[in-house]
Amino acid sequence: MGKNYEGHLVASGLKVGIVVGRFNEFITSKLLGGAQDGLIRHGADEGDIDVAWVPGAFEIPFAAKKMAESGRYDAVITLGTVIRGSTPHFDYVCNEVAKGVSSLALTTGIPVIFGVLTTDTIEQAVERAGTKAGNKGWEAASAAIEMANLAKQFEE
């Protein structure tokens, strides 16, 4: 029987980069807090968590690429909030950010986690940043921990 690979939720020793869009900061700051809390509660050292703030969601893939290619991180988490308005701008931004982040996960050799909220309303964003629907920053941190540990297993 072949090997079974599975990532574990142990963050001790992991170096994690987090890219956060400043636009809608009243939401993204809560996502960041959730991600940092999730990493630390799973054993990460505060000194092993670096944060890069960018103007908005559209700039996230660039900073995430720089972090991922630096060789300093076991995983990169991307956090942002895009809330639908009355123009098609929402669709353009969401599509490009999602494509950019997913391509980094496939090309850089380290997990790049998509934690960008794309909601129809401010209320939906608030719910996903720590109220009714949990904190998607925390969930992104959990995914980053698991995927970083899974990736390390393939290097052994």
Curated annotation (Swiss-Prot):
**GO terms under cellular component:** cytosol; riboflavin synthase complex
Which UniProt keywords are given for this protein, alphabetically ordered? Riboflavin biosynthesis, Transferase
Q: List, in alphabetical order, the GO biological process terms annotated in this UniProt record.
A: riboflavin biosynthetic process
Per the record, the domain of life is Bacteria
Using the chain's own numbering, where are the disulfide bonds? none
- InterPro entries cross-referenced by the UniProt entry: LS (IPR034964), LS/RS (IPR002180), LS/RS_sf (IPR036467)
Any transmembrane segments, and where? none
Q: Which residues bind 5-amino-6-(D-ribitylamino)uracil?
A: 23, 57-59, 81-83, 114
Q: Which reaction does it catalyse?
A: (2S)-2-hydroxy-3-oxobutyl phosphate + 5-amino-6-(D-ribitylamino)uracil = 6,7-dimethyl-8-(1-D-ribityl)lumazine + phosphate + 2 H2O + H(+)
State the SUPFAM superfamilies in the record.
Lumazine synthase
The positions flagged as active site in the entry are 89 (proton donor)
Transferase as a keyword of this entry, yes or no, is yes
Any idea which positions bind (2S)-2-hydroxy-3-oxobutyl phosphate?
86-87, 128
Query: What does the record give under GO molecular function?
Result: 6,7-dimethyl-8-ribityllumazine synthase activity
This protein's pathway reads: Cofactor biosynthesis; riboflavin biosynthesis; riboflavin from 2-hydroxy-3-oxobutyl phosphate and 5-amino-6-(D-ribitylamino)uracil: step 1/2
Enzyme type, top EC level: transferase
Protein EC: 2.5.1.78
Per the entry, what this protein does is: Catalyzes the formation of 6,7-dimethyl-8-ribityllumazine by condensation of 5-amino-6-(D-ribitylamino)uracil with 3,4-dihydroxy-2-butanone 4-phosphate. This is the penultimate step in the biosynthesis of riboflavin.
Give the family from UniProt: Belongs to the DMRL synthase family.
According to the record's subunit comment, the protein's assembly and interactions are: Forms an icosahedral capsid composed of 60 subunits, arranged as a dodecamer of pentamers.
- What name does the UniProt record give this protein? 6,7-dimethyl-8-ribityllumazine synthase
Q: What is the organism lineage in this UniProt record?
A: Bacteria, Bacillati, Bacillota, Bacilli, Bacillales
